């Protein structure tokens, strides 16, 4: 049985690293740059990068509205760092014209932990991930300022939610693709399979 085809939005960010994590857990990574490709994948990863830039690129490549429609239609999506911001309902300190995909009933704060020099690493217990704590890398990371009742908080740093799930949507403020630990990718692939999208 072949693994699910998981698209990776390949406009900016850690595309290769996410592809490696997905391959490690038996998925088939596919780079996505066009709206038509969304119909060819069982799930989608929104990698880290700069959320405002990625949002603008989504508009340039005419992907924003198709992505919103895909999320509403139930496409499983995993957003890390900037991807978490893009999946939020609102951003506290974002630009007023920040394009968002939405889908997660939450408000996030960009760069909540500070600037690049304030980046840090920490071991986190993540609900749904078995084994030792997940080593999490935070780089100009957001956090969840407010989450709706349907949002399940999977991990926190100093009481701030940094990993969440709502239905088939998963988001982390940290970069699981940078550590060589593919358990967050495994969690997402399990979500894809349980949603009926996976092969």
From Swiss-Prot:
Q: Does the entry feature the keyword S-adenosyl-L-methionine, yes or no?
A: no
- Residues at the active site: 81 (nucleophile), 175 (charge relay system), 177 (charge relay system)
Residues given in the record as L-glutamine binding sites? 49-51, 110, 139-140
- Biological process annotations from GO: glutamine catabolic process; pyridoxal phosphate biosynthetic process; pyridoxine metabolic process
Q: Which Gene3D superfamilies match?
A: 3.40.50.880
InterPro entries, per database record: Class_I_gatase-like (IPR029062), PdxT/SNO (IPR002161), PdxT/SNO_CS (IPR021196)
In its UniProt record, a GO molecular function of this protein is: glutaminase activity
This entry carries the following GO cellular component terms, namely: cytosol; glutaminase complex
What's the EC number here? 4.3.3.6, 3.5.1.2
Q: How does it assemble?
A: In the presence of PdxS, forms a dodecamer of heterodimers. Only shows activity in the heterodimer.
What is the protein name stated in its UniProt record?
Pyridoxal 5'-phosphate synthase subunit PdxT
Tell me which species this is from.
Frankia alni (strain DSM 45986 / CECT 9034 / ACN14a)
Which classification does the entry list for the species?
Bacteria, Bacillati, Actinomycetota, Actinomycetes, Frankiales
Gene field: pdxT
């Amino acid at each position: 049985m072949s693994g699910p085809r998981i698209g990776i939005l390949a406009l900016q960010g850690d595309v290769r690293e996410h592809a490696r994590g997905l391959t490690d857990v038996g998925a088939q990574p596919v780079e996505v740059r066009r709206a038509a490709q969304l119909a060819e994948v069982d799930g989608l990863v929104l990698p880290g990068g700069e959320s405002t830039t990625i949002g603008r690129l989504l508009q340039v490549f005419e992907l924003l509205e198709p992505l919103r429609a895909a999320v509403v239609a139930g496409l499983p999506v995993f957003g890390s760092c900037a991807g978490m911001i893009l999946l939020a309902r609102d951003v506290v300190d974002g630009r007023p014209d920040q394009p968002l995909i939405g889908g997660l009933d939450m408000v996030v704060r960009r760069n909540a932990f500070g600037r690049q020099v304030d980046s840090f690493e920490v071991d986190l217990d993540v609900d749904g991930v078995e084994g030792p704590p997940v080593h999490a890398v935070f780089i100009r990371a957001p956090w969840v300022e407010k989450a709706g009742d349907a949002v399940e908080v999977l991990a926190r740093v100093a009481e701030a939610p940094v990993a969440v799930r709502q239905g088939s949507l998963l988001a982390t403020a940290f970069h699981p693709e940078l550590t060589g630990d593919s358990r967050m990718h495994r969690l997402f692939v399990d979500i894809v399979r349980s949603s009926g999208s996976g092969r």
